[in-house]
């Protein structure tokens, strides 16, 4: 079997899909995308096509290493996202060719169902309690929301109190009947992160995500030493080499690589295993589309330290399409009590409605994240 062609499709709300075709008629799908940089990743995918077209798709490890090492310059968000989408499609092809789900190729199941959580609120968190009530009625008991709006490097007691009041209200309303993670989203500098963590501790969040930017990872051990809240990070780390440094330094209780950003299935299986060796949980980042979610689930199902899976149904970014709109076999992704069962179909287990995708590609949105500014006019972290 040989790879014959790579085709990309843009689709609402902010996704890029990749179709990899072979001379035996078996097709694989991937989702290579950086939110807000889809066209940059698309260009990288087609540059990398020269390394894979004409090659045997079953040699996934060799193709991965070739895409990564054949160029003198390597790594980073764009290239690793391009590799990720191609890698996902290669695993999809191999599973379909052998008639088994990808998790069987990775050693088989360690669990039957994977617990997921729902996003509530928005970029500037609001209406959280009402949304939690709606989703609890559907069986969900674990949620995540943004912890702050813009926050200056050194900010006021008022800014801290505004963040804490929201969390206090949620815990007061629901007691211990729900769990929630709080996403700082890299908006908080190290000085304020320490203050916020101290004030949030009484409300027992499940985790705090991106307490500081990945560029400030040296603060993770110091922040962890100041709080009992588990710290999570990883959506803006793109290879096992970046995770190696963080795991060696300590401080993170849960790693969150993105299967569409951090080299795909091949790389993230290694990251999960590295984290397990450090007694660190694995909870892939995935506010993306159905192929990315399927890839995450296959790694979750073979990783003993997988604890939670993000998924984007109803997330505030999904304008114009929701998670399963381009999926034919929606029933396989049905959540029961907040969990998704092992995907039964061969490959990644997601059947894409290509006709619908082609129509979406005719006039897709060119999504960009908001640009925020502080009151003094300086740019703020989004």
From Swiss-Prot:
Catalytic activity reported: D-galactonate = 2-dehydro-3-deoxy-D-galactonate + H2O
GO terms under biological process: amino acid catabolic process; D-galactonate catabolic process
Pathway field: Carbohydrate acid metabolism; D-galactonate degradation; D-glyceraldehyde 3-phosphate and pyruvate from D-galactonate: step 1/3
Needed cofactors: Mg(2+)
Location of the active site: 185 (proton donor), 285 (proton acceptor)
Residues the record lists as binding Mg(2+): 183, 209, 235
UniProt-listed Enzyme Commission number(s): 4.2.1.6
Enzyme class: lyase
Any one GO MF annotation of this record: magnesium ion binding
Cofactor descriptive note: Binds 1 Mg(2+) ion per subunit.
Chain positions of site Increases basicity of active site His: 258
UniProtKB keywords: Lyase, Magnesium, Metal-binding
SMART domains hit by this protein: MR_MLE (SM00922)
Pfam families: MR_MLE_C (PF13378), MR_MLE_N (PF02746)
The UniProt record lists the keyword Lyase: yes
TM helices/strands, residue ranges: none
Site features described as Transition state stabilizer, chain residue numbers: 310
Free-text function comment from the UniProt entry: Catalyzes the dehydration of D-galactonate to 2-keto-3-deoxy-D-galactonate.
HAMAP family: Galacton_dehydrat
UniProt similarity note: Belongs to the mandelate racemase/muconate lactonizing enzyme family. GalD subfamily.
Misc. comment: Reaction proceeds via an anti dehydration.
Name of protein: D-galactonate dehydratase
Gene encoding the protein: dgoD
